[in-house]
């Protein structure tokens, strides 16, 4: 049974993804945040949800080598990026090595994780989205599969990155410690709830404006 208290839950959804009996569903609160709901009749107490939960099990990330301040040299590309274009620059290098990128795309009233394997697809992932993006079970599966095949860059909030690293650790143990995962992660500043993002276009319409896009640079 999941032991994470509601006040400590980040809504990453990794417990629902990892549950072998599909006993956990992510349910949205009135504030717009996602929380796990456990079906006790399906739960077999395998404890896997507690092992992957980033609030209960913080993954070891080793020592920090150093800290850098970076900015893209290409000024044209920089204008379409945030945070100095650090994510874009790292992503370019990963693509040059035939890797895959996972980031968030803004679809107006919904944010979704999307995979990019080309510069054209990467362009859709640029720019900050100052709202929480719920990562789907499908996206978790695609990310883990990608790390097993080749170099993979994931941009996500610290809780989601921790969840992915916990999944890697569990899978590595299942495979006798021989599994090799090629993962690079990028952690932006945490976001507000997605409910505001969904309702904000309606608020703009009331002011006589229509929301077409939101960029944070």
Region locations from a protein language model:
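Iron-sulfur cluster-binding cysteine motifs and their immediate structural context
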Residues: 2-8, 14-31, 35-37, 47-64
């Amino acid at each position: 049974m999941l032991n994470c208290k509601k006040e400590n839950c980040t809504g990453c959804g990794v417990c629902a993804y990892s549950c072998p009996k599909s006993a956990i569903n992510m349910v949205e609160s009135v504030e717009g945040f996602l929380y796990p709901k456990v079906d006790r009749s399906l739960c077999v107490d395998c404890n896997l949800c507690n092992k992957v939960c980033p609030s209960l099990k913080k993954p070891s990330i080793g020592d920090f080598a150093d800290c850098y301040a970076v900015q893209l040299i290409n000024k044209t590309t920089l204008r379409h990026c945030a945070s100095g274009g650090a994510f874009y620059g790292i992503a370019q290098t990963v693509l040059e090595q035939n890797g895959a990128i996972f980031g968030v795309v803004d679809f107006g009233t919904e944010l979704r994780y999307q995979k990019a394997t080309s510069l054209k697809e990467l362009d859709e992932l640029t720019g900050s989205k100052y709202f929480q993006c719920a990562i789907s079970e499908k996206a978790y599966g695609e990310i883990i599969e990608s790390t097993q095949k080749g170099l993979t860059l994931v941009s996500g909030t610290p809780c989601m990155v921790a969840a992915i690293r916990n999944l890697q650790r569990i899978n590595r143990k299942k495979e006798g410690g021989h599994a090799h995962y090629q993962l690079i992660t990028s952690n932006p500043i945490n976001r507000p709830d997605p409910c505001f993002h969904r309702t904000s276009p309606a608020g703009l319409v009331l002011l006589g404006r229509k929301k077409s896009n939101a960029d944070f640079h």
